[in-house]
């Protein structure tokens, strides 16, 4: 698998490519299946439909890896938190966590056993996927998941989380530790179900100041990665902490690929990290609105990463109103332009 080879810094015939949120709303085929499912969470829980939408970008765009269709918040959902998705405001937890008693009500022993719909989707997708295409499993970072559990929804300033971080850091560490133990088991089950690689999304990394990022986020991601790498050395682990270009000097640990978001200069990440890790990223998603912008962006990134281990991706998820034709053009351009 070209994607897996690139993760391990092995030579590849061209630069492999996939896109975050590639199974998503820009595809009419996805919208059709989502309509049949009824709503987003029902689609996540219907393993046949989740598998179908995971495979769509492979069939339509010929990307080099599929990522399983799911959501990072199915983990706290199965730990016992009441999750719903509100139109216009995204995920909502009706009973956010603010005390140790709230945390102790959550089931960390059986949560990973209740996520069979994710494992079934992985099994089915791996069966249907051609042998040269990789299947990526994923989870959110403990910090990013915790922000939703504590805030009760998305947040602009993470005031409740940060209040806890500075007033009651022990409680926040307990929440993060509980999540970390569940996520280890969850990812292990994903690997057993057929995931060839794992990505940990730390979408809200940039909410933390320098030293707090390493204490409350990065160290927990490394604990998960160390667990996976000790048991499954052939499974690459990708870390994607978004928006931390100022923190790259302290990035170190046992993982394989570092995801670079579009706000981080790729040459900076290359100079600081490419001797240790394959880099993934980092085209500005809005370039996909225009073919000239795509061409310019692709050329720039391929030049920056020449002779370095690289997986092409966007620097964040593809947007819902990107024309499919432009997405196809982007994928093909990367594969053809980077051919050795």
Curated annotation (Swiss-Prot):
<comment type="similarity">
    <text>Belongs to the uroporphyrinogen decarboxylase family.</text>
</comment>
<keyword id="KW-0456">Lyase</keyword>
<dbReference type="GO" id="GO:0004853">
    <property type="term" value="F:uroporphyrinogen decarboxylase activity"/>
</dbReference>
<dbReference type="InterPro" id="IPR006361">
    <property type="entry name" value="Uroporphyrinogen_deCO2ase_HemE"/>
</dbReference>
<feature type="binding site">
    <location>
        <position position="203"/>
    </location>
    <ligand>
        <name>substrate</name>
    </ligand>
</feature>
<feature type="binding site">
    <location>
        <position position="316"/>
    </location>
    <ligand>
        <name>substrate</name>
    </ligand>
</feature>
<dbReference type="GO" id="GO:0005829">
    <property type="term" value="C:cytosol"/>
</dbReference>
<feature type="binding site">
    <location>
        <position position="148"/>
    </location>
    <ligand>
        <name>substrate</name>
    </ligand>
</feature>
<feature type="binding site">
    <location>
        <begin position="21"/>
        <end position="25"/>
    </location>
    <ligand>
        <name>substrate</name>
    </ligand>
</feature>
<feature type="site" description="Transition state stabilizer">
    <location>
        <position position="71"/>
    </location>
</feature>
<protein>
    <recommendedName>
        <fullName>Uroporphyrinogen decarboxylase</fullName>
        <ecNumber>4.1.1.37</ecNumber>
    </recommendedName>
</protein>
<dbReference type="GO" id="GO:0019353">
    <property type="term" value="P:protoporphyrinogen IX biosynthetic process from glutamate"/>
</dbReference>
<keyword id="KW-0210">Decarboxylase</keyword>
<keyword id="KW-0963">Cytoplasm</keyword>
<comment type="function">
    <text>Catalyzes the decarboxylation of four acetate groups of uroporphyrinogen-III to yield coproporphyrinogen-III.</text>
</comment>
<keyword id="KW-0627">Porphyrin biosynthesis</keyword>
<comment type="pathway">
    <text>Porphyrin-containing compound metabolism; protoporphyrin-IX biosynthesis; coproporphyrinogen-III from 5-aminolevulinate: step 4/4.</text>
</comment>
<dbReference type="InterPro" id="IPR038071">
    <property type="entry name" value="UROD/MetE-like_sf"/>
</dbReference>
<feature type="binding site">
    <location>
        <position position="71"/>
    </location>
    <ligand>
        <name>substrate</name>
    </ligand>
</feature>
<dbReference type="Pfam" id="PF01208">
    <property type="entry name" value="URO-D"/>
</dbReference>
<comment type="subunit">
    <text>Homodimer.</text>
</comment>
<dbReference type="InterPro" id="IPR000257">
    <property type="entry name" value="Uroporphyrinogen_deCOase"/>
</dbReference>
């Amino acid at each position: 698998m070209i994607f897996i080879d690139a993760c391990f810094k092995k030579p590849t015939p061209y630069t492999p490519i996939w896109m975050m949120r590639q199974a998503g709303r820009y595809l009419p085929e996805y919208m059709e299946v989502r309509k049949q499912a009824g709503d987003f969470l029902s689609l996540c829980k219907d393993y046949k439909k989740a598998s179908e939408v995971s495979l769509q970008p492979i069939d339509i765009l010929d990307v080099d890896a599929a990522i399983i269709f799911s959501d990072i918040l199915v983990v706290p959902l199965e730990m016992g938190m009441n999750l719903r998705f509100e139109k216009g405001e995204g995920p909502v937890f009706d009973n956010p966590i603010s005390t140790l008693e709230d945390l102790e009500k959550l089931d960390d022993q059986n949560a990973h056993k209740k996520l069979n719909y994710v494992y079934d989707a992985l099994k089915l997708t791996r069966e249907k996927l051609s042998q040269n295409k990789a299947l990526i499993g994923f989870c959110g970072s403990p910090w990013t998941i915790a922000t939703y559990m504590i805030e009760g929804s998305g947040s602009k300033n993470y005031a409740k989380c940060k209040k806890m971080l500075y007033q009651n850091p022990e409680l926040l560490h307990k929440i993060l530790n509980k999540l970390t133990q569940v996520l280890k088991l969850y990812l292990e089950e994903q690997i057993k179900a057929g995931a060839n690689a794992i990505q940990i999304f730390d979408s809200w990394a940039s909410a933390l100041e320098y030293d707090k990022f390493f204490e409350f986020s990065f160290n927990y991601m490394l604990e998960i990665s160390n667990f996976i790498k000790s048991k499954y050395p052939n499974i690459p682990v990708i870390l994607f902490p978004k928006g931390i270009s100022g923190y790259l000097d302290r990035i170190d640990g046992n993982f394989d690929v570092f995801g670079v978001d579009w706000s981080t200069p790729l040459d900076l990440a290359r100079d600081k990290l490419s001797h240790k890790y394959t880099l993934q990223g980092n085209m500005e998603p809005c370039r996909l609105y225009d073919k000239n912008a795509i061409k310019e962006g692709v050329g720039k990134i391929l030049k920056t990463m020449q002779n370095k281990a690289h997986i092409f991706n966007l620097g964040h998820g593809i947007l819902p109103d990107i024309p499919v034709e432009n997405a196809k053009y982007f994928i093909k351009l990367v594969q053809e332009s980077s051919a050795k």
